[in-house]
Regions:
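A short beta-strand-turn-helix
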Residues: 3-20
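CheY-like receiver
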Residues: 13-14, 63-66, 99, 108-124
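Structural alpha/beta surface segment adjacent to cysteine/selenocysteine redox centers
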Residues: 63-72, 78-80, 84
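Short active-site neighborhood of thiol/selenol oxidoreductases, capturing the structured segment around
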Residues: 16-30
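Non-catalytic, surface beta->alpha helical segment in thiol-disulfide oxidoreductase systems
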Residues: 79-112
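Conserved phosphotransfer microenvironments
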Residues: 33
Protein backbone atom coordinates (compact mmCIF):
# COMPACT_ATOMS: atom_id res chain seq x y z
CA UNK A 1 0.00 0.00 0.00
CA UNK A 2 1.27 3.48 -0.79
CA UNK A 3 2.17 5.87 1.97
CA UNK A 4 -0.51 8.47 2.66
CA UNK A 5 0.08 11.99 3.93
CA UNK A 6 -1.58 13.02 7.18
CA UNK A 7 -2.20 16.47 8.57
CA UNK A 8 -3.76 17.94 11.66
CA UNK A 9 -7.28 17.54 10.28
CA UNK A 10 -7.10 13.79 9.65
CA UNK A 11 -4.36 12.49 11.96
CA UNK A 12 -6.52 11.51 14.96
CA UNK A 13 -9.04 9.58 12.87
CA UNK A 14 -6.31 7.82 10.89
CA UNK A 15 -4.39 6.54 13.91
CA UNK A 16 -7.58 5.58 15.79
CA UNK A 17 -8.58 3.16 13.03
CA UNK A 18 -8.51 -0.58 13.69
CA UNK A 19 -5.30 -2.33 12.73
CA UNK A 20 -1.70 -1.18 12.57
CA UNK A 21 -0.72 2.31 11.45
CA UNK A 22 2.93 3.35 11.06
CA UNK A 23 3.61 7.08 10.92
CA UNK A 24 6.88 8.63 9.76
CA UNK A 25 7.14 12.21 11.03
CA UNK A 26 9.68 13.67 8.64
CA UNK A 27 11.15 16.86 7.30
CA UNK A 28 12.56 17.50 3.84
CA UNK A 29 15.61 19.31 5.20
CA UNK A 30 16.80 16.35 7.28
CA UNK A 31 19.21 13.94 5.62
CA UNK A 32 18.15 11.23 8.07
CA UNK A 33 14.50 11.80 7.14
CA UNK A 34 15.30 11.52 3.45
CA UNK A 35 17.24 8.29 4.06
CA UNK A 36 14.46 6.79 6.18
CA UNK A 37 11.79 7.72 3.61
CA UNK A 38 13.20 5.10 1.20
CA UNK A 39 13.25 2.46 3.96
CA UNK A 40 9.70 3.38 5.04
CA UNK A 41 8.34 3.27 1.47
CA UNK A 42 9.95 -0.14 0.89
CA UNK A 43 8.41 -1.46 4.12
CA UNK A 44 5.02 -0.19 2.95
CA UNK A 45 5.38 -2.29 -0.20
CA UNK A 46 6.35 -5.37 1.86
CA UNK A 47 3.38 -4.96 4.23
CA UNK A 48 0.43 -3.92 2.03
CA UNK A 49 -2.07 -4.95 4.71
CA UNK A 50 -0.87 -2.18 7.04
CA UNK A 51 -1.36 1.56 6.78
CA UNK A 52 1.79 3.63 6.30
CA UNK A 53 1.49 7.39 6.64
CA UNK A 54 3.78 10.40 6.72
CA UNK A 55 3.55 13.75 8.45
CA UNK A 56 5.58 16.65 7.08
CA UNK A 57 6.84 18.22 10.30
CA UNK A 58 7.62 21.48 8.51
CA UNK A 59 4.15 21.90 7.03
CA UNK A 60 2.43 20.44 10.11
CA UNK A 61 4.53 22.06 12.84
CA UNK A 62 1.58 22.35 15.25
CA UNK A 63 0.78 18.64 14.86
CA UNK A 64 4.43 17.65 15.31
CA UNK A 65 4.58 19.75 18.48
CA UNK A 66 1.34 18.24 19.77
CA UNK A 67 2.80 14.77 19.21
CA UNK A 68 5.94 15.75 21.11
CA UNK A 69 8.22 15.29 18.11
CA UNK A 70 11.49 17.19 18.52
CA UNK A 71 13.59 15.56 15.81
CA UNK A 72 12.96 13.98 12.46
CA UNK A 73 12.51 11.33 11.51
CA UNK A 74 10.38 9.98 14.32
CA UNK A 75 8.57 6.69 13.81
CA UNK A 76 5.27 6.20 15.62
CA UNK A 77 3.27 2.96 15.52
CA UNK A 78 -0.35 2.58 16.56
CA UNK A 79 -2.32 -0.60 16.93
CA UNK A 80 -6.09 -0.38 17.25
CA UNK A 81 -5.77 3.28 18.16
CA UNK A 82 -3.14 2.73 20.88
CA UNK A 83 0.34 4.22 20.51
CA UNK A 84 2.65 1.24 21.02
CA UNK A 85 5.96 2.62 19.71
CA UNK A 86 7.48 6.08 19.26
CA UNK A 87 11.17 6.70 18.71
CA UNK A 88 13.24 9.34 16.94
CA UNK A 89 15.81 8.28 14.39
CA UNK A 90 15.62 5.92 11.48
CA UNK A 91 15.66 2.15 11.40
CA UNK A 92 17.08 -0.13 8.72
CA UNK A 93 14.54 -2.14 6.72
CA UNK A 94 15.01 -5.39 8.63
CA UNK A 95 14.40 -3.55 11.91
CA UNK A 96 11.15 -2.10 10.54
CA UNK A 97 10.08 -5.64 9.60
CA UNK A 98 10.97 -6.90 13.09
CA UNK A 99 9.01 -4.02 14.64
CA UNK A 100 6.00 -4.87 12.46
CA UNK A 101 6.19 -8.53 13.55
CA UNK A 102 6.43 -7.49 17.20
CA UNK A 103 3.44 -5.16 16.95
CA UNK A 104 1.42 -7.86 15.15
CA UNK A 105 2.15 -10.25 18.04
CA UNK A 106 1.14 -7.86 20.83
CA UNK A 107 -1.60 -9.03 23.17
CA UNK A 108 -3.60 -5.82 23.00
CA UNK A 109 -5.90 -6.82 25.86
CA UNK A 110 -2.82 -7.09 28.08
CA UNK A 111 -1.44 -3.79 26.79
CA UNK A 112 -4.69 -1.95 27.51
CA UNK A 113 -5.01 -3.65 30.91
CA UNK A 114 -1.49 -2.58 31.90
CA UNK A 115 -1.77 0.93 30.43
CA UNK A 116 -5.44 1.95 30.66
CA UNK A 117 -4.51 5.61 30.17
CA UNK A 118 -2.51 6.79 27.17
CA UNK A 119 1.21 6.98 27.81
CA UNK A 120 2.72 10.46 27.90
CA UNK A 121 4.16 11.49 24.56
CA UNK A 122 7.91 11.34 24.52
CA UNK A 123 9.28 11.09 20.99
CA UNK A 124 12.47 12.95 20.30
Amino acid sequence: MATTTLGGADYAAAVAAPGIVLVDVRTARSGSSRAFTAVFEAAARRHPDLRFAAVDADAEAALAAELGVRSAPTLMVYRDGVLVFAEPGWLPGDSVDLLVATVRDLDMAAVVAQYPEPLPRRPG
